Amino acid sequence: MMAAAVVRAEVRRQRREERKKMAAARTTEDPPENHVVADVARGTGAVTRSSSSSLVVSSSSASGSDESSSASPLSFPVSSPSTAVRSPGSAGVSTSLCSVERMVELSAQSPAADFSVSEAWRFEEAVNMALVACEAVSPYDRFRLIETPDENFLLVTNVIPRESAEVPVLDSSSSGGDSGPEDKKKNVGNKTAGEKNGGGSRAKRRRRRRAPKNDAATPSFLRRHDVLERFAAAAKPLPSLCVRDYALRNADRVTYDGELIYGSYLLYRKAHVELSLSSNKVQHVEAVLRQVYTPGLLDHHNVCDVEALLWLLYCGPRSFCARDTCFGREKNGCPFPALLPKLFYEPVRDYMTYMNLAELYVFVWYRGYEFPAPTPQATTAGGGGGSGGGGGAGACAVETSASAGRVDDAGDEVHLPLKPVSLDRLREVLQAVRGRFSGREVPAWPASSRTCLLCALYSQNRLCLDLARDEARTVSYSPIVIQDCAAAVTDVTLSHILPGQSTVSLFPVYHVGKLLDALSLNDAGLITLNL
């Protein structure tokens, strides 16, 4: 035993000496460093090291001078392996400033004119070091890149506030969450007495657990329940997030006996109105198809043939207003296209959301719809060539003009050209969409309405007048608001005064006749709203 103890002590002593030698060698070769300074000027990046406890990425002016002292460095704490104690305020805002001209301008210069490959590599190394430093300080935070007027780039982290619900701390005197020593003694005494008296069967003990009686254990149970109620009553819910361009007010209660429950406003602009009522959407569809096939934008379950899907959405036989009294039949001889959310009339920003909604609308609109078998005279669906209830309408010759819209003999199919799409492709798209949504609970109610914008405004006017006449207590409807067409709004509105706010127009009444007279259709099938 003595020999083993001596051997272990000798081994520990040798290990301590080796660690001291390694630490001494590390100190002589590379002194402890706790921050990095990256100086980048006109494509040249120089990385220096200092001995303070902060990370600085400084910049000089864009003139290309080597005086890095003229820059204003921004310091922020960095966790270093050689730092033993970290201050509590080291989790503050972390910034790194890279002051250079644009990389595009540098790469456009000739190698002989103040620019070389080595300088570009040095610049890239300095920028990468700044990114790595920020990620090391706050690996789970977002970054925001801000460009200054003098073509500098400021990389800021921890700019998004973190919301947390505040829960008051209850002390032991008020909470009563745990039973005191006396209650524990009583419970132990009752349990011992019950065991001495026989205790009863397991079923009786289960019943006693489910419904506690008025015995010594009841006050403790009630106190625990009271603590839960206090926590539930004192907890403050997180503030509701405002949706941009949709919700006007987040109001859910009023000061009188009525109720105010309304959905998001459906905001459209003049450009949205013109594109929604136009039958020619070739330019918009081509802009979508130009980027939609980029790898990584769509998921594996999305439809592969995007062109056929957009054909069904924008100019298919079920993409027009389903009302028999549509204003388009009187204006142009054919119904107007059905109204879609405004993201379908804007440049696409999120292709995943765009495609998922497009597939949902196609699935709902073409539910139970089948294209007829192609005839030898017509093998393509050039402008709605895949007609449905019209029987042999697929064999009809379709005019090439985008304004040549017409209704077939059945009165429910419209033929408007976008681009020739074969019927086989349309059937495959419908089969793929039905295979994705069939048998699943999908929000089909918002997409089930096939109504144009003017018919929707007419129905909104009727609903507004009915609500004003009947003094409805509950309103659950999302009214349409055209933001830059104030000339078409009448003086008749159903308004409500919110507490502490001015009058809010909930259901504006639009002059549909004035909107209809302001529409002008050109030969290309584009509609212009002259208001």
UniProtKB/Swiss-Prot annotation:
Q: Which domain of life is it from?
A: Viruses
Q: Where is the composition biased (Low complexity)?
A: 50-82
Report the InterPro entries cross-referenced here. Answer: Herpes_UL95
One Pfam match, by short name? Herpes_UL95
Cellular component annotations (GO), alphabetically ordered:
host cell nucleus
Where composition is biased (Basic and acidic residues), the residues are: 9-33
Q: Which UniProt keywords apply?
A: Early protein, Host nucleus
Composition-biased stretches, type Basic residues, lie in 202-211
- Range of residues in the leader sequence: none
UniProt entry tagged with the keyword Iron: no
Report the subcellular localization.
Host nucleus
Annotated region (Disordered), positions in chain: 1-92, 167-216
Sequence similarity: Belongs to the herpesviridae UL95 family.
Q: What is the protein's known function?
A: Participates in the expression of late viral mRNAs. Expressed before viral DNA replication, UL95 assembles at the viral pre-replication complexes (pre-RCs) containing the early viral protein UL44.
Q: What is this protein called?
A: Protein UL95
